[in-house]
Amino acid sequence: MKRVLTALAATLPFAANAADAISGAVERQPTNWQAIIMFLIFVVFTLGITYWASKRVRSRNDYYTAGGNITGFQNGLAIAGDYMSAASFLGISALVFTSGYDGLIYSLGFLVGWPIILFLIAERLRNLGRYTFADVASYRLKQGPIRILSACGSLVVVALYLIAQMVGAGKLIELLFGLNYHIAVVLVGVLMMMYVLFGGMLATTWVQIIKAVLLLFGASFMAFMVMKHVGFSFNNLFSEAMAVHPKGVDIMKPGGLVKDPISALSLGLGLMFGTAGLPHILMRFFTVSDAREARKSVFYATGFMGYFYILTFIIGFGAIMLVGANPEYKDAAGHLIGGNNMAAVHLANAVGGNLFLGFISAVAFATILAVVAGLTLAGASAVSHDLYANVFKKGATEREELRVSKITVLILGVIAIILGVLFENQNIAFMVGLAFAIAASCNFPIILLSMYWSKLTTRGAMMGGWLGLITAVVLMILGPTIWVQILGHEKAIFPYEYPALFSISVAFLGIWFFSATDNSAEGARERELFRAQFIRSQTGFGVEQGRAH
């Protein structure tokens, strides 16, 4: 059990956050026709939305940002739909099912990055940028080098996420639907390409909104039924769970998963700053009309996500009571059928029968599609807008840029399917950890300092950004997950699971040192431009609004 918990501690914090990567052994379940029918209804409905959206996508603004006409409330729901993953739902509830109170600490830990986005990033990002966060980073710095660095940071994060998503999708669908792994991966890839290729940000937004509503409804119903079972008393919920759990009262004790304080701090920093550097999340702030709506987006999104993670805590304890103590959900060896990640799915059956089980299974699949669609659009915009239109072919027409974007969507989709098949039996949890570390070590420092530090120069941003990215990759390779578990060495060169504490420090120090020592005329000019940028970031004066965006 201790080894299982250690593995969960190493993989779930990141996998649950956004990757849908269901780690560990998966037992294929019998074909669930109710779930398949419900999922097909969702697919047909969302493809109808994609067709509707395709008729309204007439320009680059429409494709990248839905014309800037998404409201703060809608965008908040879409952000929540982009961020709340199937592994958040299944993984966190499984963590609570096995470890109790520690699951709450992890689930709430995913929210710590959102106050940073709310207070430091959202408004200025919207006022300074148009389509990608590279627009903000390059506002007063050299366009070419900064956009190349930002695009590389975005593409690496997107690529790592997509691989983890595709592998997680295949495993999850095998687990829930009883479908073949390869069929599942191809299905997700094709649907992902159709949503983004034809509907752009408008279709992606509505897929994410629908998914968020379905997931919040399903989780709310499960939590309500659990609380009804215990007379709406948390005291009864915890008492009954402690009475049937093998650990007894120990499930209410915190600190059982990450005992090393440096690892805990590094994990926390990675989650906090990584969230604020995810390209597919940052891109959503350009879909609203102004900074006020951007701020409202974060407010609503944080509320929806906070509510959802509290529900997963109730669901996890409900699973201890109604699933863990019921031999009907266990195999001959006494283990949960399908593994611990099936705890929430079994609970759906326990509280709502086969029909609700089919609904929850379909919702879990829908969450994957919503997340991969956002990732694909973020990757495509990094190539077409940042690299093609602003570096390699300046002055490209909107039509040319959109063509490159759609070609990139196809390429990303095919690559995601191929790598999803190739990585079927690999430990992909480290990819998500690495993606988070890169987002925190490369993207976040550049975004933050470009908006707030007047002495930042292109030299400092380039040196610090690349140092942060390379440090995160190297330390992850030398750490226990890759060096020992994957490459088979006896002892890790870098002793900690999570590199964020060190790679973020290297990035900020590098940016500070190389900017402070930059005495060039170009550096002086970039410092002088900060005042104009600051006024624009505060007022939004000069930024295109609404449909013009």
From Swiss-Prot:
One of its GO terms (cellular component) is plasma membrane. It is found in: Cell inner membrane. Belongs to the sodium:solute symporter (SSF) (TC 2.A.21) family. The chain crosses the membrane at residues 33-53, 77-97, 103-123, 148-168, 183-203, 206-226, 262-282, 303-323, 355-375, 404-424, 428-448, 464-484, 493-513. This is Cation/acetate symporter ActP. It holds the Pfam family SSF. It comes from Escherichia coli O17:K52:H18 (strain UMN026 / ExPEC). InterPro entries: Cation/Ac_symporter_ActP (IPR014083), Na/Glc_symporter_sf (IPR038377), Na/solute_symporter (IPR001734), Na/solute_symporter_CS (IPR018212), Sodium:Solute_Symporter (IPR050277). Transports acetate. GO terms for molecular function: acetate transmembrane transporter activity; glycolate transmembrane transporter activity; symporter activity. It is a multi-pass membrane protein. The lineage of its organism: Bacteria, Pseudomonadati, Pseudomonadota, Gammaproteobacteria, Enterobacterales. Keywords: Cell inner membrane, Cell membrane, Ion transport, Membrane, Sodium, Sodium transport, Symport, Transmembrane, Transmembrane helix, Transport. Signal peptide: none annotated. The keyword Zinc does not apply. One of its GO terms (biological process) is plasma membrane acetate transport.
